[in-house]
C-alpha cells in the first residue's frame, strides 16, 4: 500500500463500520482509559489520547514480529485520533477554566 491508500483505508475504518461497532472514538477511548486506570490503580491518570498512543505502541510491537499493512493503517488511524482527542481535551480544559 502507498501512503494515500493507507490513509484512505484508515479514514474508511474510522468513519465506517468501526464507528458503528464501537461508538464515538473519544467516548470509547475514555472508557478504555478508565478501565486501564482502574487496572493500574489510577496511578498514571491516563487520558483518552494516551490510549491511542499506547495502541500505536502495541501495533509497533506487533510489527517487530510480522509486517502487516493493517497495522500501518491502524497506526495512522490511532495517530489521527490522538491528535483529535488531544485538541478536544485542550478545548474542554480551556472552557472549564473560564
List each language-model region with its residue ranges:
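Intrinsically disordered, low-complexity regulatory regions
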Residues: 1-98
